[in-house]
Design a protein with these regions (language model features):
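Active-site neighborhood of HAD-like aspartate-dependent phosphohydrolases
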Residues: 1-30
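Helix-loop "lid/cap" segments that line or gate small-molecule binding pockets
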Residues: 14-15, 35-50, 106, 138-139
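Short acidic capping loops at alpha-helix termini that bridge into adjacent secondary structure
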Residues: 23-27, 51-52, 114-118, 146-150
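Metal-dependent phosphoesterase signature
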Residues: 41-80, 88
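Short, acidic loop-to-helix structural element flanking the phosphoryl-transfer center
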Residues: 66-94, 100-108, 132, 160
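Structural recognition of alpha->loop->beta junctions
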Residues: 111-119, 181-202
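Conserved Lys-Pro-Asp/Glu-containing loop-to-beta segment of HAD-superfamily phosphomonoesterases
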Residues: 129-159
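Acidic, Mg2+-coordinating phosphoryl-transfer loop and its flanking beta/alpha structural elements
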Residues: 150-190
């Protein structure tokens, strides 16, 4: 899911509400993978150690909750990828650090994701990524051993979690990386530049 536009808009509203100038959407996009931490860092230069961080984090969540399906879409090719997975009778799921407070409405708004065999949110397990627990929970819900799973992610934490869970790992360059990260250095088993590249990997598996 490409939620960067709504993430950025929620953070930018916090700036304009305070009389600060709006920032271009492109400024927020590379930080979308870091969630509220990334958005507040870009909007205000704020880190979690700031005394006002928790209050602004909740304000960001409230802003995002009111508009999280306005501009959010799936990345190009994801719809076709899911259709192909279903035709090949391959199970798939979603593991995210986002709270169920956000993931459940998003899933409801996007019928395509009703075909997911598992959905693991930030509070589904005691630990979030990069801990392997959420990925192991997803594998359990799918009825699969971890070594029969491939985890695709666009953040270094995703690959760390996948490797720790004993899964095949694929780094995706089409997410929010920008020029701030190098997925070739993450230690993933493979790197893809578009969702449909995953089909080619599966054919070789």
């Amino acid at each position: 899911i490409d939620s960067a536009p709504d993430f950025g808009a929620a953070a930018d509203k916090m700036r304009t509400d305070r009389g600060m100038p709006s920032l271009p959407a492109e400024r927020y996009r590379p930080m979308a993978g870091a969630g509220a931490r990334g958005m507040l860092g870009e909007a205000f230069g704020m880190t979690p150690e700031h005394p006002d961080y928790e209050a602004l984090r909740e304000e960001f969540f409230v802003n995002y909750e009111t508009r999280m399906t306005h501009l959010t879409t799936v990345f190009d090719g994801v719809g076709h990828l899911i259709v192909q997975l279903l035709q090949r009778q391959l199970m798939w799921g979603v593991v995210t650090n986002k709270s169920a407070r956000f993931t459940e409405p998003l899933t409801f708004a996007m019928p395509l994701f009703a075909t997911a065999g598992a959905g693991v949110s930030g509070e589904s397990t005691p630990h979030a990524k990069p801990h392997p627990a959420p990925l192991l929970e997803a594998a359990s819900r799918l009825g699969l051993n971890p070594d029969r799973c491939i985890y695709v992610g666009d953040d270094h934490r995703d690959i760390v979690a996948g490797l720790a869970a004993g899964m095949g790992t694929v780094a995706a360059t089409y997410g929010y990386l920008g020029d701030r990260a190098d997925p070739l250095q993450w230690g993933a088993h493979a790197v893809i530049n578009s969702p449909l590249d995953l089909l080619q990997l599966l054919e070789k598996a």
